């Protein structure tokens, strides 16, 4: 579980996040939704430690991120998997080398152990027989699957996905959504997904938080989002 308490962030005097409070639950897909420029990407970057908030707390389990020492932060990073918007695969590395990459930094496993774990992760995302291929030889959907395999390589407790459907056709988007949801439940991860895709929200949104102009205006689930008591959210739903 991750708790966010009264989080605020500004850039050049402009407040981008305003007193955000939200809880992200374990074993569920927790969605951060909102229009472009609403602040959802800034919130995601604060959650994973790429930015520091001006005020407020981010609590992983029972430990505040701001109060962790460097050793504790390193331990936390080992428990975080990230699926970047563009998959962020290394073009110079093969599929299996991409998946093994985080293991080289955070484990003392032998090359054989790393390869075995990478193959297991690739099987989990239904990528078989592509170990020696390079990312540019694969479709966007396959690249996304490999990105997910790399994100779960260290068996993380927390999974963050930034616009996982970006650049995908509707059918492939559904498959990727279901894969993220299935892995979340199988490994009991706390998964946080940043998206503006309504199909994705309705497909896997166990918990949903709507951000508008830096404020968390509404929280609910996929059962209640189509009849919200929030005018700004109604506009967002109609536009998407």
Which residues make up each language-model segment?
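Helix N-cap at the start of a conserved alpha-helix in ABC-type nucleotide-binding domains
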Residues: 170-172
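Helix-to-loop junction immediately C-terminal to a conserved catalytic motif
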Residues: 48
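Conserved ABC transporter NBD signature motif
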Residues: 56-64
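Conserved ABC ATPase signature
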Residues: 134-138, 142
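Catalytic Walker B motif of ABC-type/P-loop ATPase nucleotide-binding domains
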Residues: 159-162
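Conserved ABC ATPase "signature" region
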Residues: 64, 111-129
């Amino acid at each position: 579980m991750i708790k966010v308490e009264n989080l605020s962030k500004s850039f050049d005097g402009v407040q981008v996040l305003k007193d955000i409070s939200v809880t992200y639950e374990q074993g569920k897909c927790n969605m951060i939704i909102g229009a472009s420029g609403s602040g959802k990407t800034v919130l995601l970057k604060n959650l994973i430690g790429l930015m520091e908030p001006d005020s407020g707390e981010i609590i992983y389990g029972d430990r505040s991120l701001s109060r962790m020492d460097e050793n504790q932060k390193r331990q936390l990073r080992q428990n975080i998997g990230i699926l970047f918007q563009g998959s962020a695969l290394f073009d110079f590395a093969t599929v299996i080398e991409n998946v093994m990459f985080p293991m080289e930094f955070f484990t003392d496993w032998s090359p054989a152990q790393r390869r075995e774990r990478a193959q297991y992760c690739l099987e989990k995302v239904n990528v078989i027989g592509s170990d020696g291929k390079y990312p540019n030889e694969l479709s966007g959907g396959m690249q996304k699957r490999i990105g997910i395999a790399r994100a779960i390589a260290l068996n993380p407790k927390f999974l963050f996905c930034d616009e996982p459907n970006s650049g995908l056709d509707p059918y492939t988007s559904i498959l990727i959504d279901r894969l993220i949801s299935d892995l979340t439940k199988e490994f009991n991860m706390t998964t946080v997904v940043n998206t503006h895709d309504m199909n994705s929200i309705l497909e896997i949104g166990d918990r949903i938080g709507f951000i508008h102009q830096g404020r968390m205006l509404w929280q609910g689930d996929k059962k209640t989002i189509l009849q919200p008591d929030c005018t700004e959210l109604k506009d967002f739903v109609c536009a998407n």
